[in-house]
């Protein structure tokens, strides 16, 4: 496995949950659909326990329920796979599939300031919960979490340049 320096913008696309089989495949929980859309030959970056990154070449993947089982050219057996359990797998930003207008990769939204139509700050978007029906944005303000449904009636504007999201919350969603 070749050690590399971190490219300018690596985006996490999944997390290694365990090894799979004696040939060193990795069982990965994907963050969205970016990982599953990749083809054999694609190069990924995995963070190793020592903090560095290894470049790995995908030789194949298959779905197993919600998980993906991925084989990499550089990992030959379970002993070679074990150090990556619990680590995230990354792609360079320019290798991600494009998104439609009005859609955003989660990593682009994390860190946005969330404000109401009246300009009241609700905090910073810290994480996104995928619920199946619609995502839920988790804003953090003064140690409290505010859950915001990611639906068109609530999310009024996303401005990535200004790092801001404007929301119109239903009455009673946030206690005073």
Curated annotation (Swiss-Prot):
One family from Pfam that matches here is PRC_RimM
Keyword Cytoplasm in annotation: yes
| GO MF annotations in UniProt | ribosome binding
Give any Gene Ontology cellular component: ribosome
All residue ranges annotated as the PRC barrel domain in the record: 101-173
Question: What processes in GO biological process is this protein linked to?
Answer: ribosomal small subunit biogenesis; rRNA processing
Quoted from the entry, the domain comment is: The PRC barrel domain binds ribosomal protein uS19.
Q: What does this protein do?
A: An accessory protein needed during the final step in the assembly of 30S ribosomal subunit, possibly for assembly of the head region. Essential for efficient processing of 16S rRNA. May be needed both before and after RbfA during the maturation of 16S rRNA. It has affinity for free ribosomal 30S subunits but not for 70S ribosomes.
Q: Subunit composition?
A: Binds ribosomal protein uS19.
| Family named by the database record | Belongs to the RimM family.
Q: Which NCBIfam families match?
A: 16S_RimM (TIGR02273)
Q: What's the protein here called?
A: Ribosome maturation factor RimM
